[in-house]
Amino acid sequence: MSNPLRDARDRRLNRIAGPGALVFFGITGDLARKKLMPAVYDLANRGLLPPNFAIVGFGRRDWTAQDFADQAREWILASARTPFNETVFAQLAAGMRFISGAFDDDGAYEQLAATLDELAESRSTGRNHAFYLSIPPSWFEVVCQKLSEHKLAQDKNPGWERVVIEKPFGHDLASARELNSIVESVFPPDAVFRIDHYLGKETVQNLLALRFGNQMFEPLWNNKYVDHVQITMAEDIGIGGRASYYDGVGAARDVIQNHLLQLLALTAMEEPISFDADHLRSEKEKVLTAVKLPEDLGAASARGQYTSGWQGAEEVVGFLDEEGFNPKSNTETYAAVKLEINTRRWSGVPFYLRAGKRLGRRVTEIAVVFKKAPNLLFTDHEDDEFGQNAFVIRVQPDEGATIRFSSKVPGTQMEIRDVTMDFGYGNAFTESSPEAYERLILDVLLGEPPLFPRHEEVEQSWRILDPFEEYWAALPTQPDPYAPGSWGPESSDELMAKDGRTWRRP
């Protein structure tokens, strides 16, 4: 169904959602309270949702629609990016409904069906429905089957139905395939939106613009000039209250399998024919398919667990001392792996991926490190005085990019030193970047899936990670300890040192 607010001649309004209802399963969870509802409000506040938009919360709380609206106001006041506007909120609240019940309660789904019928009349939703499953994956099958049984999915109505699922997309390749089969047995593949919120970040999308919208980078983006690539996701916090989720998952399953391998795919992919969803996702899938696993998994990986100690001015407890944890747990809070991509462009260029908690600072970045220039003219300088040029894309928190190169130091001597040239979103653009969930929710409502991985991408990611997980699970020892506030265990530094390289200090 076309969007009546979208005029092909008017480029200003080409991303306003049409009529519809967004149904949140698990509306009382942390993600919905802190990210999803504030993002929906921010979209409305920016004029990107129609005035008759509807929101349905589904949860176990015994709430009325007014109770839900009152709670939503508190969540929005606490976490929304844009200023609170009473008129905008009142318009949004008028379309809020709440369904009280368990995820396997047939009566609740009957009430949901009746509510969506009512909204089709009172809010003119056009029977367009997006079901957002902000729930544990163990409930995906039940919810999808109930939606199908109650004719809320694959129904022959004039509108559309889409389903949104959050990571983790399984815990290994077998479970990912099973999950994909379950979801796609109810919803067609093009109606399934797998959320990886990193792909909604401006800097991640800007990576495509930097690579393919400029002439200066792409000629150097290959194994003739690139020495290696480092992709880092560091957090300065511990597991907090996520003990029940994190134990048995670990850093690799939590972020390397999804966020970091997606960043690798975007960094290494060939230029797509267009930004059409199929073209973009096909190029990412080709990269992941070409990832070559190392023969020696131990030499190409490192794991760690943070210990008790001081992080800045704060004394923190170690991972094994966190409440609710098994003191003999083999779950890692830090993981690093070395991968190679078996293509003509990237053959011989290692990609180093690392992620961890309680590290030196919160930062996510992609660093493309170039080979050293020949030291022919500057013969009175030692080779180690010449750094390697690098192009660094900062995903968070200071979104932007940095180029590192050598320059002459002012003075009478020909002395060389590394300097940086910096681009920051906050300095270059007056409008602040929207939150990732704003972009992704809007894309769901518009039916534009380029930023959402297909099941083939998910399965390829697990194909890459599973051998590491199996190798680590067979080790008789726990992951290596590292101090809070450091940059991981010594084994991670040794992983790089074996290749004559070092980790960047973000």
Describe each region flagged by the PLM.
Residues M1-I165, F169-P506:
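Secretory/organelle targeting and membrane-embedding segments
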